[in-house]
Amino acid sequence: MISREMEIKIPSGLDPSTIALFIQIASQYDSSVYVEVKNKKVNAKSIMGMMSLKLQKGEDVTIVADGQDEDAAVSGVATFLGA
């Protein structure tokens, strides 16, 4: 299991269309991928879970992945959120 702390840099934050793209990226990986913010941890492949976070630009999150391609998963998801 690996994790990376980062700041969301997407100008619009994670609106529904951005979340849909995010889930497509997270779903490319076999590893379990989670997003943690404050005391909440959600499955990064769940549209309802991700929408419940209401993430905005400038928020700090932790990306966690566990599985055979965990390094690639964290890197891919973090790259998207840091765009």
Spans of model-derived segments:
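Aromatic-residue detector
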Residues: I2, F22, Y29, A78-F80
